[in-house]
């Protein structure tokens, strides 16, 4: 039996990108939820290079009397997961909860995650009930979740929900990983001995629009595929072999038909030859693109540039910047 350590301090990590409309309500509701815990807490808000007034509002919130808010300002936009990792590097709690700033996942669910973590779980995930997203987002999410489950063997139902709780040793383990492309829920489950999911409410977005454009979703998909496994590279080799065998077989067939039916038939098959040629060329480009994605990520890792740069940290105990 493993010793279960009770949670003494909770750190809530929230990435913020152009969320000035939702910030006042986010801070109020998150603070109220944390106060109901009866434990020490801190709320870390990471500004991910916002172009609106979000950064200024975060600084004011940290400097308010009696504040529990730590504001971390990044110099530019690095993406949701990099911003969360920046928050992880400044937490002081022994249980860390991540939460989106759009209020689609209610902060009022925080006490339930803390209570479940107190049962001895390393990671507490969540599954969104009655999800209030578009059909495209929900369908894409289901496909990605199935891909992750088959690849990792972890029966987690909703990897896309960022309302999650992590024990401190899990966060420390993730901080020791230096890959540039990080998908936090998957990375955490690699180190977790005990993980569980609980159902949570999901609300419509009240302010603004989703920051995940179509291209950002495509980039996220590449992050998932390349950080999970090298299986696509093996599949690429298999596909190349199939195409090579198929091309050779078609060539033999064309020679036989040419000898059997004469040159007139061959002339009439020109368009079919072009169609086959373009099919093979397209398959080659797909394979080259996938291979290039892996090589590009290797190049990024070799350069060893930091995944984020923290410009300022404002803590409630002092108005001085770190």
UniProtKB/Swiss-Prot annotation:
Classification via InterPro entries: ArnC_tfrase, Glyco_trans_2-like, Glycosyltransferase_2, Nucleotide-diphossugar_trans
Top-level class of the enzyme under EC nomenclature: transferase
Positions in the Cytoplasmic compartment: 1-235, 291-322
Source organism, top-level taxon: Bacteria
The EC number(s) this enzyme carries: 2.4.2.53
Transmembrane segments: 236-256, 270-290
Keyword terms: Antibiotic resistance, Cell inner membrane, Cell membrane, Glycosyltransferase, Lipid A biosynthesis, Lipid biosynthesis, Lipid metabolism, Lipopolysaccharide biosynthesis, Membrane, Transferase, Transmembrane, Transmembrane helix
GO CC annotations, alphabetized: plasma membrane
An example molecular function term from Gene Ontology annotations: undecaprenyl-phosphate 4-deoxy-4-formamido-L-arabinose transferase activity
Function: Catalyzes the transfer of 4-deoxy-4-formamido-L-arabinose from UDP to undecaprenyl phosphate. The modified arabinose is attached to lipid A and is required for resistance to polymyxin and cationic antimicrobial peptides.
Similarity comment: family membership: Belongs to the glycosyltransferase 2 family.
NCBIfam families (UniProt xref): PRK10714.1
UniProt cross-references to HAMAP family, sorted A to Z: ArnC_transfer
Name assigned to this protein: Undecaprenyl-phosphate 4-deoxy-4-formamido-L-arabinose transferase
Organism per entry: Escherichia coli (strain SMS-3-5 / SECEC)
Higher taxonomy: Bacteria, Pseudomonadati, Pseudomonadota, Gammaproteobacteria, Enterobacterales
Gene expressing this chain: arnC
